[in-house]
């Protein structure tokens, strides 16, 4: 059984833990840098990206998170987590973790009051997935090796690049665990490759 961490500084941590466990993996809430060494994959949950960055800096997580990405262990960023994984952010000088060759626009779907749900088709996951968008970012540009998994109204809302997955929406806020199960499979495959 693979062990998947959820960065536990802010955001929908409990919901991600439930989704991971429902998908047949062990979940760990990561609150200390040392825990990164014990896990096979990591979810960066939604929340407020500037607050999350402040907490990441306060608890000295940034360089260990970049090191985790360099080790090519799978990472999945949802909403604010997508912003953390992007290597370019519209209107900002500096990326955060910068593991994915994507350009992201923050709060692109509007503010909290503009939150909405949309039915999505997600490559590798299936049809009729309810995406919960809360002040959601979206991807405006990608490198050639980034795969677009889902679009909404002509905007890229789920992308994959190697061991990295990012979604504008919150898959953990529904009882449909297919997106989390997709990430669990990515982690299982990556772990098997390391063993071989």
UniProtKB/Swiss-Prot annotation:
- Keyword set for this entry? Glutamine amidotransferase, Hydrolase, Lyase, Pyridoxal phosphate
Keyword Hydrolase among record annotations: yes
Quaternary organization: In the presence of PdxS, forms a dodecamer of heterodimers. Only shows activity in the heterodimer.
Summarizing the function annotation, the protein's role is: Catalyzes the hydrolysis of glutamine to glutamate and ammonia as part of the biosynthesis of pyridoxal 5'-phosphate. The resulting ammonia molecule is channeled to the active site of PdxS.
Question: What is this protein identified as?
Answer: Pyridoxal 5'-phosphate synthase subunit PdxT
* Annotated organism of origin: Bacillus cytotoxicus (strain DSM 22905 / CIP 110041 / 391-98 / NVH 391-98)
- Which residues does the annotation say bind L-glutamine? 47-49, 106, 134-135
Q: Show the GO MF annotations.
A: glutaminase activity; pyridoxal 5'-phosphate synthase (glutamine hydrolysing) activity
Show the GO cellular component annotation of the record.
cytosol; glutaminase complex
């Amino acid at each position: 059984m693979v062990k998947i961490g959820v960065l536990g500084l802010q955001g929908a941590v409990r919901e991600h833990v439930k989704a991971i466990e429902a998908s047949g993996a062990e979940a760990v809430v990561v609150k200390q840098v040392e825990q990164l060494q014990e896990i096979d994959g990591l979810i960066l949950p939604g929340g407020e990206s500037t607050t999350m960055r402040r907490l990441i800096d306060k608890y000295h997580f940034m360089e260990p998170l970049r090191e985790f990405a360099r080790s090519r262990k799978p990472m999945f960023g949802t909403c604010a987590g997508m912003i953390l994984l992007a290597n370019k952010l519209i209107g900002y000088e500096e990326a955060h973790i910068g593991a994915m060759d994507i350009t992201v626009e923050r709060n692109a779907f509007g503010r909290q009051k503009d939150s909405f749900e949309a039915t999505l088709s997600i490559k590798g996951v299936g049809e009729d997935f309810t995406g919960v968008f809360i002040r959601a970012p979206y991807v405006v540009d990608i490198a050639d090796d980034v795969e677009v998994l889902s679009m909404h109204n002509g905007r890229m809302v789920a992308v994959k690049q190697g061991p990295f997955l990012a979604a504008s929406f919150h898959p953990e806020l529904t009882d449909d665990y297919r997106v989390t199960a997709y990430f669990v499979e990515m982690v299982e495959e990556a772990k098997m490759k390391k063993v071989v």
